[in-house]
Amino acid sequence: MNASVAIQVLPKVEGEELIGIVDEVIAYIKSTGLNMSVGPFETTIEGDYDELMDIVKECQKICIDKGAPSVMAYVKINYNPKGIWTIEKKIKKHHLEIK
């Protein structure tokens, strides 16, 4: 694993339709089988750089295929050929179980 990507898609649609399209994008990302984390503003995915770039492209295509006339995608990329810190390593200490 040499990269992580945080992606936020904003399809140009009105109201609740936005949530439905974003849900479709998240379902697609889940279907890739890669380690991922859904947040309130973006979804983070870990994997191989080239595979992640293909996923970013597909996320935008899904928005269009689901009826959005256009889509804005905000993408953050962390790439290191030698490997990256995992999502778990970065956030585990902030998500301790409440007892």
Predicted regions span which residues?
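Charge-rich, low-complexity N-terminal segments
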Residues: 1-99
